[in-house]
Amino acid sequence: MKNKDAVFKALNDSTRRLILDELSERNEMTLYELTIRLITKHSLDISRQAIAKHLSLLDEAELVKTTRKGKYRVLTFNKEPLRNLLEDWLE
């Protein structure tokens, strides 16, 4: 139940949903790349620090994974929590 609540909390914000949209469209991005895409594509007035806070909530819900590639931290969209949530309801 706790993870379900975390998923719903994470999805309850339009900026976090845009982040997931961008990661779904182009998986594996750095925070810098994600910030640039959100600012240019969606005309958001948002800082990297604000995006990092949104990412921490997405991470708590296990919707975003961060891995190291060289000196960069790369973000990916983990769709499993959403699949599990829907499967529980649809079974």
Where are these regions (language model features)?
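Phospho-regulated, low-complexity intrinsically disordered regions of nuclear gene-regulatory
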Residues: N78-E91
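Beta-hairpin "wing" of winged helix-turn-helix
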Residues: D59-K69, T76
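A generic local structural motif
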Residues: D5-A6, A61
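Single-residue recognition of alpha-helix boundary sites
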Residues: N27, K65, W89-L90
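Short, hydrophobic-biased segments on the C-terminal half of alpha helices
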Residues: L55-S56
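Hydrophobic transmembrane alpha-helix bundles
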Residues: R68-R73, L86-W89
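N-terminal helix-turn-helix DNA-binding core of bacterial DNA-binding proteins
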Residues: K2, K9-A10, S14-S47, Y72-P81
